[in-house]
Amino acid sequence: MASHDHDHDHHHHHSHDDGDHHHSHHQDGSHGGGGGSWVGEDGRVWHSHDGLAPHSHEPIYSPGDFSKRAPPLISRRFAERAFTVGIGGPVGTGKTALMLALCRSLREKYSLAAVTNDIFTKEDGEFLIKHGALPEERIRAVETGGCPHAAIREDISINLGPLEELSNLCKADLLLCESGGDNLAANFSRELADYIIYIIDVSGGDKIPRKGGPGITQADLLIINKTDLAPAVGADLAVMERDALRMREGGPFVFAQVKHGVGVEEIVNHILQAWEIATGNKRR
């Protein structure tokens, strides 16, 4: 099992799906605090933001392939942290609305808890509490600072801590983790998410699926949201379907209108199927 030291006093090293990442954590704080960048001993350019440990990013040379996506971790102990669903996607595509819809669909039969990521606020967590998605004690809001993708990939401890705490506190069956809004290159580490959902919407036009990026090509499930807006923005859903199938090599995707409940049942079925396979449990 992949392990993380939540203390972060000094160097630690852990393996991610596409290579090793070395995080240099300086005791003297010389590279923390207000940010900045520098060249590390490994030759990579490192940077830091308020609230996050120094980190570097692996260069991305291609959008990736669905068939070559990182598999779920074999040695996961769900007694230590429940099956975790990662929900990523650009700002405004409907991640928080999906979190709310999933909570409403699953909370009667399953013990749930949720962690939200925002860059400088706790707005998404507060939204879930305000709308009664789950009891307040089952929700944690994390402020990631200016590099939201690091919190779901390079320096996941900021999310692992709350997820593990909630998992034990709530005896959770499922954990939901919403990333901060980011670009098409951002995707979850398998050390954090057992099942990865990436959500885009049609407001950017029908070109988005073919632009690719790890989220679109390698998420376990792609959601194309707000299909009701297609006529207004001139997006052709047939083109989006064709491109999604091609970019994802036939991997699953769902057309949805999450706010109106369209496609939510199909999304829930995908999640529960993965949960059953990973945990050996039967859906209720």
From Swiss-Prot:
Residues at which GTP binds: G89, P90, V91, G92, T93, G94, K95, T96
GO molecular function: GTP binding; GTPase activity; nickel cation binding
GO biological process: urea catabolic process
Record-linked SUPFAM superfamilies: P-loop containing nucleoside triphosphate hydrolases
Keywords (A to Z) from UniProt: Chaperone, GTP-binding, Nickel insertion, Nucleotide-binding
InterPro entries cross-referenced by the UniProt entry: CobW/HypB/UreG_nucleotide-bd, P-loop_NTPase, UreG
Basic and acidic residues composition bias: residue spans: 15-29, 41-51
PANTHER family, sorted: UREASE ACCESSORY PROTEIN G
Subunit organization: URED, UREF and UREG may form a complex that acts as a GTP-hydrolysis-dependent molecular chaperone, activating the urease apoprotein.
Record-given protein name: Urease accessory protein G
